[in-house]
Amino acid sequence: MSERSVSKQKSSDRWYSIIAPEQFDRSELGSTFADDPEKIHGRTLEVTLGDITGDQGENNTKLTFKVNDVTSDAAYTEFIKHELARDYLRSLIRRGASKIDAAITVRTTDDYRVQLQPVAFTTKKADRSQEQAIRRVMIDLVEDAADERTFADLIDAAIEGQLSSAIYGEAKTIYPLRRVEVKKLTLEARPEEVAAEEAAAVDVDEADVAVE
């Protein structure tokens, strides 16, 4: 390789600041080194909420972001997952009590498909019917929350505790609860992906009708 080629390669190497979405105040999440912007596109980065807010008490909340746009010196991201640390969740489990969870897939008002996983911890052992009733409350309130919120607002409701508080307030009338959390929220599909899936489903349905 000529000296000129080596010099050109070195000059293209640069640091890129990794930037959080607007709802996280465009905070800098970190930095990465690359010789080609395309090598950064699609990368994921996991940080804690405490890394963003500076509050160590929020280090149990893990956030995952994915690079979806790269400029000359910055890599911008989208939110793809919120998850509570396993050690924290294990600390909430008590012998002789119930742990009730659910996985609920919903669609927000701006057509993002998201899965949320709330979990409730009772003070003592609940019976099967009580567990089912609490799970039903979880499903209903998560679906209601999605029906009223954009993707960004639903993320805020999960991370800031409004959703878990709403579940706690209603479910505790069924059986005494010690704590409710949203242990995980995952982006499953963006609006354009949802639209493409629906269009494909319509095409399949029309083909079935034509065959009949």
Curated annotation (Swiss-Prot):
Protein family according to the UniProt entry: Belongs to the eukaryotic ribosomal protein eS1 family.
Keyword vocabulary terms for this entry: Ribonucleoprotein, Ribosomal protein
Classification via HAMAP family: Ribosomal_eS1
GO MF annotation, one: structural constituent of ribosome
GO biological process: translation
Pfam families the UniProt entry points to: Ribosomal_S3Ae
Lineage: superkingdom: Archaea
Entry's Gene Ontology cellular component terms: ribonucleoprotein complex; ribosome
UniProt cross-references to PANTHER family, sorted A to Z: 40S RIBOSOMAL PROTEIN S3A
Species: Haloquadratum walsbyi (strain DSM 16790 / HBSQ001)
Protein name, UniProt field: Small ribosomal subunit protein eS1
InterPro entries in the record: Ribosomal_eS1 (IPR001593), Ribosomal_eS1_arc (IPR030838), Ribosomal_eS1_CS (IPR018281)
